[in-house]
């Protein structure tokens, strides 16, 4: 999961990557998500975005890349939205979002009764999101548990302390988190596997064919009793009703992976 130095006073340092990802999606979707508008509307966040926009506008190639990345992020978000909603509709009642950042799915997805959503990230990021949404009067659509984890603390322990039940099936989301260095990635997936009861599901995005010899997350899951499906992201424009050559070029090596634990 993301690790940044605690104690820094700069908002750009503390939540910059999350803010910029949220802004990228909003720029493509027209910012029709009121919660995204809330998270992006604070003065210091606006300052971060304005500086970023000024830099992007100065470099045509950077502007084109920004559009490609934003388009992919928006399509990826819709894909995972549908996957999580379907899994919950089929009976799973707890979801864990890893490196949640400014994710608002606990608030905006149509969760069924009895649903619990755990969000794991740095305490600073989660506090920023909670304060912004609370001030706006937003209410979660599920039982919402922000799980703040410092860099020196095992995240599974914090998850258990927050009420997670490893004996029940779980929906895991690791959006934008992989790939990681081999040892780190293997350890993360191994921990998820150990915390997952039969019937659990996981969704994440990955990069295929870029680094020979890199740890194969889908293959690892398959070898341990997970039924795995890989969707090449270049096919997403067709799935979502969009046709964009720029998005196709950016997503040439990207894939969306979903898996269900059978054994």
From Swiss-Prot:
Organism ancestry: Bacteria, Bacillati, Actinomycetota, Actinomycetes, Mycobacteriales
Pfam families reported in the protein's UniProt record: LCM
GO terms of molecular function: methyltransferase activity
Record-linked SUPFAM superfamilies: S-adenosyl-L-methionine-dependent methyltransferases
Name of the featured protein: Putative S-adenosyl-L-methionine-dependent methyltransferase Mjls_0079
Coiled coil regions, renumbered to chain: none
Alphabetical keyword list: Methyltransferase, S-adenosyl-L-methionine, Transferase
Keyword S-adenosyl-L-methionine set for record: yes
Task performed by this protein: Exhibits S-adenosyl-L-methionine-dependent methyltransferase activity.
Keyword Protein transport: no
Gene source species: Mycobacterium sp. (strain JLS)
Disulfide bonds: none
Database matches in InterPro entries: Ppm1/Ppm2/Tcmp, SAM-dependent_MTases_sf, SAM_mthyl_Trfase_ML2640-like
Biological process per Gene Ontology, one example term: methylation
Similarity comment: family membership: Belongs to the UPF0677 family.
